[in-house]
Swiss-Prot record:
Keywords: Acetylation, Lipid metabolism, Mitochondrion, Oxidoreductase, Phosphoprotein, Transit peptide. GO terms for molecular function: alcohol dehydrogenase (NAD+) activity; hydroxyacid-oxoacid transhydrogenase activity; metal ion binding. Pfam families: ADH_Fe_C, Fe-ADH. The modification N6-acetyllysine is found at K443. PANTHER family: ALCOHOL DEHYDROGENASE (PTHR11496), HYDROXYACID-OXOACID TRANSHYDROGENASE, MITOCHONDRIAL (PTHR11496:SF83). The lineage of its organism: Eukaryota, Metazoa, Chordata, Craniata, Vertebrata. It comes from the Eukaryota. The keyword Transit peptide applies. GO terms for cellular component: mitochondrion. It comes from Mus musculus. GO terms for biological process: glutamate catabolic process via 2-hydroxyglutarate; lipid metabolic process. Disulfide bonds: none annotated. Catalyzes the cofactor-independent reversible oxidation of gamma-hydroxybutyrate (GHB) to succinic semialdehyde (SSA) coupled to reduction of 2-ketoglutarate (2-KG) to D-2-hydroxyglutarate (D-2-HG). L-3-hydroxybutyrate (L-3-OHB) is also a substrate for HOT when using 2-KG as hydrogen acceptor, resulting in the formation of D-2-HG. This is Hydroxyacid-oxoacid transhydrogenase, mitochondrial.
Length: 465
């Protein structure tokens, strides 16, 4: 414990020494000179979020929205399963009723790849659309964001906007077309964020595009769409909300993130925890704790499923600006290196570890590890999840939160760790290798992590109970 305390004190002292920022817009009177590396911590954060409209049946307004935007030629993106279901039919009826011409693209892949992104991009380029509508879960919304971006910047190479170090991570400076997102799952919060995630097949890792410029113009959050979701989809989507909230709330503060951008356009979408994101994260976590189990166990519980739909958006607002960290960074190779595992109640023809499941399975180990920094926040979140924290010691915050998470997952019959997905200790080097490129998110973790640390976290996540 003494070593942990010393590490925390050292970290905080470094934070205090580096919080001032030498920026063109920052008064030199109150700033300090950069350190030897030339890097200083940021001094500001931004809140960027899509317009959100919530209400049962609100999807039927989409045609009027597009008409108000002056759209005449719209791309409607969805997947094969949803294309025959009510959410898409309602959108098509609304478009037709309001005289909006549209083409349907229903080849979105669940857990998209660079290849499936490029197929959608090619469709968008050929269509010369003046607006987009995405109806589906995170896979559909992310695919539509990418299609809009690259159709609006037709001469860009695919890796130009992909996050470094896999891509070039260029800032988006071209104007995009309006995009309306209609989420049908309660997990990714993609209707609120400027992030599009995909599997980069060449390296077998997940990466993405992160820019405020690609966030949807409008998100239509209609709780009626949640009633069609299978129970396992509700659970795994809810785990994504859970970890979005936990990770954004326990991420390093924005004022500890460095370097400070020399130009505001270079400020990353994921900036670190901040006072506004904190509010959304805590509120989302409270909803998850109260309603997720109900939403999973009773498909007809409209109240619970409606609350989870809101929680997804709330957590999206939080993490879309604060960011996520280790659970998500480690989840990408878990999904990308899947062997034969196929999740129940997912109608796919390929092995699949749902994103929310890949994220939550490492959460007990991760938060045990990160709680050395900001233990008060870890203990607070454990209390929200139902742990008795009145007599808990602050130094046990990570263990208390980990136990609360294990109980929460056990109550929902979650697979017993990575081993249940087909992974073994022999896979750990590959899982670590797949995590290392995820520095955009892992650097927001409250504790730095070595390869040995990551190996230990994966090993601890092989079994949960």
């Amino acid at each position: 414990m003494a070593a942990a305390a010393r590490a925390r004190v050292t970290h905080l002292l470094r934070h205090l020494q580096s919080t001032a920022c030498q920026c063109p817009t920052h008064s030199h009177t109150y700033s300090q000179a950069p350190g030897p590396s030339g890097k200083t911590a940021d001094y500001a954060f931004e809140m960027a979020v899509s317009n959100i409209r919530y209400g049962a049946g609100v999807t039927k307004e989409v045609g009027m929205d597009l008409q108000n935007m002056g759209a005449k030629n719209v791309c409607l993106m969805t997947d094969k399963n949803l294309s025959q279901l009510p959410p898409v039919q309602i959108v098509m009826d609304s478009l037709s009723k309001n005289g909006i011409s549209f083409q349907v693209y229903d080849d979105v892949r669940v857990e998209p790849t660079d290849g499936s992104f490029m197929d959608a991009i090619e469709f968008a380029k050929k269509g010369a659309f003046d607006a987009y509508v995405a109806v589906g879960g995170g896979s559909t919304m992310d695919t539509c964001k990418a299609a809009n971006l690259y159709a609006s910047s037709p001469h860009s190479e695919f890796l130009d906007y992909v996050n470094a170090p896999i891509g070039k991570g260029k800032p988006v400076t071209v104007p995009l077309k309006p995009l309306i997102a209609v989420p049908t799952t309660s997990g990714t919060g993609s209707e609120t964020t400027g992030v599009a995630i995909f599997d980069y097949e060449h390296l077998k890792v997940k990466t993405g595009i992160a820019s405020r410029a690609i966030k949807p113009t409008l998100g239509l959050v209609d709780p009626l769409h949640t009633l069609h979701m299978p129970c396992q989809v509700v659970a795994n989507s809810g785990f994504d909300v859970l970890c979005h909230a936990l990770e954004s709330y326990t991420a390093i503060p924005y004022s500890m993130r460095s370097p400070c951008p020399s130009n505001p356009i270079q400020r990353p979408a994921y900036q670190g925890s901040n006072p506004i994101s904190d509010i959304w994260a805590v509120h989302a976590l409270q909803i998850v704790a109260k309603y997720l189990k109900r939403a999973v166990r009773n498909p007809d519980d409209l109240e619970a499923r409606s609350k989870m739909h809101l929680a997804s958006a709330f957590a999206g607002i939080g993490f879309g600006n604060a960011g996520v960290h280790l659970c998500h960074g480690m989840s990408y190779p878990i999904s990308g290196l899947v062997k034969t595992y196929k999740a129940k109640e997912y109608n796919v023809d390929h092995p699949l570890v749902p994103h929310g499941l890949s994220v939550v399975l490492t959460s007990p180990a991760v938060f045990t590890f990160t709680a050395q920094m900001f233990p008060e926040r870890h203990l607070e979140t454990a209390g929200i999840l139902g742990a008795n924290i009145r007599t808990a010691r602050i130094q046990d915050a990570g263990l208390v939160l980990a136990d609360a998470l294990r109980k929460f997952l056990f109550d929902l019959n979650v697979d017993d760790g990575l081993a249940a997905l087909g992974y073994s200790k022999d896979d750990i080097p590959s899982l670590v290798k797949g995590t290392l490129p995820q520095e955009r998110v892992t650097k927001l973790a409250p504790r730095a992590q070595s390869e040995e640390d990551l190996s230990a976290l994966f090993e601890a996540s092989m079994k949960l109970y």
